[in-house]
C-alpha cells in the first residue's frame, strides 16, 4: 500500500513537474514576444516621429508655395490694372498739344468774327 501511494505521489510530482516546465517554457516565449513587441513599438515611435517631422516640413513648404503663388497672382493683377489705367488715361484725357491749340482757335475765330 505504501508502494502504491508512493508511486501515485511520484506520478503526481512528475505531472506537476511537467506542467511547471510547460509553464516556464511559455513564460520564456512570452518574454521573447514581449521583447519583440517592445522593439516594434520603439520602431513605430521612431517612424511616427519621422512622419510628424516630414509632414510639418511639407506643410511649411506648401504654405510658402501658396504665399509665393498669391504674391505672383497679386503682381499680375496689379500689372493688368496698371495697364488698363494707363490705356484709359491715354484715351480719355486730352493731350496737352491738342487741347491748348483747339480752344485758341475757337477763341480766335470768335474774336475776329463778323461782330468785331
Swiss-Prot record:
<dbReference type="GO" id="GO:0030659">
    <property type="term" value="C:cytoplasmic vesicle membrane"/>
</dbReference>
<keyword id="KW-1003">Cell membrane</keyword>
<dbReference type="GO" id="GO:0070062">
    <property type="term" value="C:extracellular exosome"/>
</dbReference>
<feature type="transmembrane region" description="Helical; Anchor for type IV membrane protein">
    <location>
        <begin position="73"/>
        <end position="93"/>
    </location>
</feature>
<keyword id="KW-0333">Golgi apparatus</keyword>
<dbReference type="InterPro" id="IPR042855">
    <property type="entry name" value="V_SNARE_CC"/>
</dbReference>
<feature type="modified residue" description="Phosphoserine">
    <location>
        <position position="49"/>
    </location>
</feature>
<comment type="function">
    <text>May participate in trafficking events that are associated with myogenesis, such as myoblast fusion and/or GLUT4 trafficking.</text>
</comment>
<keyword id="KW-0472">Membrane</keyword>
<feature type="region of interest" description="Disordered">
    <location>
        <begin position="96"/>
        <end position="116"/>
    </location>
</feature>
<dbReference type="GO" id="GO:0048471">
    <property type="term" value="C:perinuclear region of cytoplasm"/>
</dbReference>
<feature type="modified residue" description="Phosphoserine">
    <location>
        <position position="48"/>
    </location>
</feature>
<dbReference type="GO" id="GO:0007519">
    <property type="term" value="P:skeletal muscle tissue development"/>
</dbReference>
<dbReference type="GO" id="GO:0031090">
    <property type="term" value="C:organelle membrane"/>
</dbReference>
<feature type="modified residue" description="Phosphoserine">
    <location>
        <position position="41"/>
    </location>
</feature>
<keyword id="KW-0517">Myogenesis</keyword>
<dbReference type="GO" id="GO:0007517">
    <property type="term" value="P:muscle organ development"/>
</dbReference>
<dbReference type="InterPro" id="IPR042166">
    <property type="entry name" value="Vamp5"/>
</dbReference>
<dbReference type="Pfam" id="PF00957">
    <property type="entry name" value="Synaptobrevin"/>
</dbReference>
<protein>
    <recommendedName>
        <fullName>Vesicle-associated membrane protein 5</fullName>
    </recommendedName>
</protein>
<keyword id="KW-1133">Transmembrane helix</keyword>
<dbReference type="GO" id="GO:0043001">
    <property type="term" value="P:Golgi to plasma membrane protein transport"/>
</dbReference>
<feature type="topological domain" description="Vesicular">
    <location>
        <begin position="94"/>
        <end position="116"/>
    </location>
</feature>
<dbReference type="GO" id="GO:0005770">
    <property type="term" value="C:late endosome"/>
</dbReference>
<feature type="site" description="(Microbial infection) Cleavage; by C.botulinum neurotoxin type X (BoNT/X)">
    <location>
        <begin position="40"/>
        <end position="41"/>
    </location>
</feature>
<dbReference type="GO" id="GO:0014704">
    <property type="term" value="C:intercalated disc"/>
</dbReference>
<keyword id="KW-0221">Differentiation</keyword>
<dbReference type="InterPro" id="IPR001388">
    <property type="entry name" value="Synaptobrevin-like"/>
</dbReference>
<feature type="domain" description="v-SNARE coiled-coil homology">
    <location>
        <begin position="5"/>
        <end position="65"/>
    </location>
</feature>
<keyword id="KW-0812">Transmembrane</keyword>
<dbReference type="GO" id="GO:0005886">
    <property type="term" value="C:plasma membrane"/>
</dbReference>
<keyword id="KW-0217">Developmental protein</keyword>
<keyword id="KW-0597">Phosphoprotein</keyword>
<keyword id="KW-0175">Coiled coil</keyword>
<dbReference type="GO" id="GO:0030154">
    <property type="term" value="P:cell differentiation"/>
</dbReference>
<feature type="topological domain" description="Cytoplasmic">
    <location>
        <begin position="1"/>
        <end position="72"/>
    </location>
</feature>
<dbReference type="InterPro" id="IPR042581">
    <property type="entry name" value="VAMP5_R-SNARE"/>
</dbReference>
<comment type="similarity">
    <text>Belongs to the synaptobrevin family.</text>
</comment>
<dbReference type="GO" id="GO:0009986">
    <property type="term" value="C:cell surface"/>
</dbReference>
<dbReference type="GO" id="GO:0005802">
    <property type="term" value="C:trans-Golgi network"/>
</dbReference>
